[in-house]
């Protein structure tokens, strides 16, 4: 079976889904179910998973017994804040070690601060975390994060929440070719074709939130994204035909084609 393996655990779904921006927890659960995802991301600074006892708890709707939770550090702008946030998540989730690290460098673009990201990754890996890390599409940084010991590299396709799709497929392709841990596109996916393209490039998975939660029909979009990720993966496994410039090839065989008879040719 074709599975995604992260930190030693296998998953049949290659779609990772965020839990923010839905109108309520009921819609969140419905989108998660339709998407078929097995890994859901949770922004610890914005979502209650037990740190606020008097508020609705996401874990009542998406229990850890049914899904792999991926606590993330959305909203963190320093390595220290990111490390502190994920240590809190580990306490709230009874020692859960799989986390998503993101250290932002700019409030307007939400580009990652790669220097702070590298610093936080070193601390977290040394502290026993399995770190899936949001980063730029710089292949050198991706290799450095892999060398530190990160469990998955998560380069952006374009700005978080922009829906602009994959702006630099060439860098993504280099990252895919150079690192051995899973490469999961994170940020910028806007519609199903973006997810399919990411998978056709050879990405191991796609993480999204806004593309589903901000769609006119989030539940239907979750279904579309599931199919797109599956189709893109199958296309990559199948191997696309080579592109040819100025070399058209008929799809029908040329043998046995009907040609004009010598008699008719002579009469002409």
Swiss-Prot record:
GO molecular function, one term: thiazole synthase activity
InterPro entries: Aldolase_TIM, Thiazole_synthase_ThiG, ThiG
One GO location term (cellular component): cytoplasm
Entry keyword Cytoplasm: yes
Pfam assignment, any one: ThiG
Reactions accelerated catalytically: [ThiS sulfur-carrier protein]-C-terminal-Gly-aminoethanethioate + 2-iminoacetate + 1-deoxy-D-xylulose 5-phosphate = [ThiS sulfur-carrier protein]-C-terminal Gly-Gly + 2-[(2R,5Z)-2-carboxy-4-methylthiazol-5(2H)-ylidene]ethyl phosphate + 2 H2O + H(+)
Predominant localisation class: cytoplasm
Stated role: Catalyzes the rearrangement of 1-deoxy-D-xylulose 5-phosphate (DXP) to produce the thiazole phosphate moiety of thiamine. Sulfur is provided by the thiocarboxylate moiety of the carrier protein ThiS. In vitro, sulfur can be provided by H(2)S.
Similarity comment: family membership: Belongs to the ThiG family.
Name used for this protein in its record: Thiazole synthase
The organism of origin for this protein: Nitrosomonas eutropha (strain DSM 101675 / C91 / Nm57)
């Amino acid at each position: 079976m074709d599975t995604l393996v992260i930190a030693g655990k296998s998953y049949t779904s290659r779609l990772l889904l965020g839990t923010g921006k839905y109108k309520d927890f009921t819609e969140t659960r419905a989108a998660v179910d339709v998407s078929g995802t097995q890994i859901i991301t949770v922004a610890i600074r914005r979502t209650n998973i037990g740190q606020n006892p008097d508020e609705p708890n996401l874990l009542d709707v998406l229990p850890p017994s049914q899904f792999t939770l991926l606590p993330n550090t959305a909203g963190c702008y320093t390595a220290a804040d990111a490390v502190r946030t994920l240590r809190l998540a580990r306490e709230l989730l009874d020692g859960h070690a799989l986390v998503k690290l993101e250290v932002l460098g700019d409030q307007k673009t939400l580009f990652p601060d790669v220097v702070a990201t590298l610093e936080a990754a070193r601390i977290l890996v040394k502290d026993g975390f399995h770190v899936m890390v949001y980063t730029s599409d710089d292949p050198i940084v991706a290799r450095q994060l892999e060398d530190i010991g990160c469990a998955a590299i998560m380069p952006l396709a374009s700005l978080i929440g922009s829906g602009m799709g994959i702006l630099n497929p060439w860098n993504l392709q280099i990252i895919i070719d150079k690192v051995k841990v899973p490469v999961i596109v994170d940020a910028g996916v806007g519609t199903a074709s973006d997810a399919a393209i990411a998978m056709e490039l050879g990405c191991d998975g796609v993480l999204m939130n806004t593309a589903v939660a901000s769609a006119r029909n989030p539940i239907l979009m979750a279904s579309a994204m599931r199919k797109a990720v599956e189709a893109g993966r199958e296309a990559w496994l199948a191997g696309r035909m080579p592109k040819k410039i100025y070399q058209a090839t008929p799809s029908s065989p040329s043998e046995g084609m009907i040609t004009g008879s010598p008699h008719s040719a002579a009469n002409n």
